[in-house]
Curated annotation (Swiss-Prot):
Similarity comment: family membership: Belongs to the NAD kinase family.
Designated gene of the protein: nadK
Binding positions (NAD(+)): D59, G60, K64, N128, D129, D158, T169, A170, Y171, A172, L173, S174, A193
Organism of derivation: Petrotoga mobilis (strain DSM 10674 / SJ95)
Name the UniProt record assigns to this protein: NAD kinase
EC number: 2.7.1.23
One GO-annotated biological process of the protein: NADP biosynthetic process
Catalytic EC class: transferase
Localization terms from the record: Cytoplasm
Single annotated GO MF: NAD+ kinase activity
InterPro entries noted in UniProt: ATP-NAD_kinase_N, ATP-NAD_kinase_PpnK-typ_C, NAD/diacylglycerol_kinase_sf, NADK
Keyword field: ATP-binding, Cytoplasm, Kinase, NAD, NADP, Nucleotide-binding, Transferase
Length: 274
C-alpha cells in the first residue's frame, strides 16, 4: 500500500510531521512515497503510483487538494488538524486507527462532484463553491444569471454563491441555503442579500451551463473566488460560466461514520434544543 501525504504547514510543524505521522506509517507496511505542503508542486510520477492521498489539515487543506486528486483519480483520506474538519474522517489523535483501517481496508468512499468555472481561457475546478463578492463593503452589484440562455435571476445585491452539494454546508449554509446530500449531482445558486422579495436560492441540474453577467457596480469591482481563493476580477459587462465538472473525487468516510453522522456530530443538525 502506497500513500502520498499533503499537509498544512501552518497546522503541522516539521517535528510533528516526522515524529507523529511519518514515523508511525514507516513502522507499518504502508509506504509513504512522498509528502508536500498543500498547494505545492507534486511530481506526476509520485501522484500516479500512490494508492491514496492522505491529507493532514482542515477543510481548507482538502479544498486545495481536490483538483489534483480528481485529475489523478486518487481517493482522499482527510485527517483533521484544524477546527471543524467537516470533510475529515479522522482526528490527528487517531493515526493508529487510520493505519489499521487502511491495512484492513476498513474505509469506504463517497463520490463528490466538482464545479468548473470558465473565465476567458482560464478553467478552475473547485469542490465547494464559486463566489462573486464586492470589493467594497458599501453599494451593490447588478447581476444577471442565465441557465442555457434563459434569464433565471436579475438582481441587485451583495453577490452570488454557486455551490456544489459538498459546499452546501460551507458559505452557502451561512447564506441561507439548504443542506444538500453530497452524493447528489446538482448545482446550487444563492444570491447574497438580494434587494428583492422574489429572489430565492435555486437548485439547477448539472447538465446545464450557467452564465453570470456583471451588469454594473455602484462602487468598486467584483472578485470571483474559487474555494476561497481569488481567481478573477470582474468589471461591468464581463461574464463567467459555471458548469458541473465531469470529474469527481472519492472522499473517505470511516465505516460507521456516514454523512448524516457528520451532520449530527459536527454541526449539531437535527438536534432538539432543551
Amino acid at each position: 500500500m502506497k500513500i502520498f501525504i499533503f499537509y498544512n504547514p501552518l497546522k503541522l510543524s516539521n517535528d510533528d510531521l516526522e515524529e507523529n505521522i511519518l514515523k508511525p506509517f514507516n513502522e507499518s507496511n504502508i509506504e509513504v512515497i512522498g509528502y508536500a505542503a498543500a498547494g505545492s508542486t507534486v511530481e506526476e510520477k509520485q501522484a500516479q503510483v500512490a494508492d491514496f492521498f492522505v491529507i493532514f489539515g482542515g477543510d481548507g487543506t482538502v479544498l486545495k487538494i481536490a483538483e489534483i486528486a480528481a485529475i489523478f483519480s486518487k481517493p482522499v483520506i482527510a485527517v483533521n488538524t484544524g477546527n471543524l474538519g467537516f470533510l475529515s474522517s479522522y482526528s490527528s489523535s487517531e493515526i493508529k486507527e487510520l493505519i489499521e483501517d487502511i491495512q484492513k481496508e476498513n474505509i469506504s468512499f463517497s463520490f463528490r462532484h466538482l464545479l468548473e468555472c470558465h473565465v476567458g481561457t482560464k478553467k478552475v475546478v473547485v469542490l465547494n463553491d464559486i463566489v462573486l463578492l464586492k470589493s467594497q463593503p458599501l453599494g451593490t452589484m447588478n447581476v444577471d444569471v442565465k441557465i442555457e440562455e434563459h434569464t433565471l435571476f436579475s438582481f441587485a445585491g451583495d453577490g452570488l454563491i454557486v455551490s456544489t452539494p459538498t459546499g452546501s454546508t460551507a458559505y452557502a449554509l451561512s447564506a441561507g441555503g439548504p443542506i444538500i446530500h453530497p452524493e447528489l449531482n446538482v448545482v446550487q445558486l444563492i444570491p447574497l442579500a438580494a434587494h428583492a422579495l422574489n429572489i430565492r436560492p435555486f437548485i439547477a441540474p448539472p447538465t446545464q451551463r450557467i452564465e453570470i453577467i456583471l451588469k454594473n457596480m455602484s462602487k468598486g469591482f467584483v472578485y470571483v473566488t474559487g474555494d476561497g481563493d481569488i481567481i478573477h476580477r470582474m468589471e461591468p459587462g464581463m461574464s463567467i460560466f459555471v458548469t458541473s465538472s465531469e470529474m469527481t473525487i472519492k472522499l473517505a468516510q470511516r465505516n460507521g461514520n456516514n454523512y448524516l453522522n457528520a451532520l449530527d456530530k459536527k454541526l449539531g443538525f437535527g438536534r432538539r434544543f432543551e
